Regions:
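Fe(II)/2-oxoglutarate oxygenase catalytic core
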Residues: 1-79, 85-111
Length: 111
């Protein structure tokens, strides 16, 4: 938070959501987690808690210019934090079901 990304974090303002991405249809295209609504405008950090790893595909990717960065260790029980303004996606699940708990840590709106 404050030391790494210089964010002044307040806490959780939304309940985390359970997401399931099913084989052949589960994916989430490129997006950011910020938006114009009151809650979405104060999202500073997104997080994903990986609840299983017995699936194929379904990679969490972050857009970094022309390349896509794939954070390592997307394994059961691991927790990934990332700035909410980063463009990211989840690729198509090709086998099994991907289960993840997602949420956001909030702070004052970006200025």
């Amino acid at each position: 938070g404050k030391e790494g990304w210089k964010f002044n974090l307040i806490g959780m303002a939304e309940r985390p959501m359970m997401m399931e991405y099913e084989e052949g249809q589960g994916k989430y295209d490129w997006h950011i987690d910020l938006g114009p609504s009151r809650l979405a405008s104060t999202r500073k950090l997104g997080f994903s808690l990986f609840l299983n790893d017995d699936y194929e595909g379904g990679e969490f990717q972050i857009k970094t210019g022309r390349e896509n960065y794939i954070p390592p260790q997307q394994e059961t029980g691991n927790l990934l934090f990332f700035p909410s303004y980063l463009v990211h996606r989840v690729t198509l699940v090709t086998k099994g079901t991907r289960s993840v708990l997602v949420g956001w840590v909030h702070g004052n709106s970006f200025s």
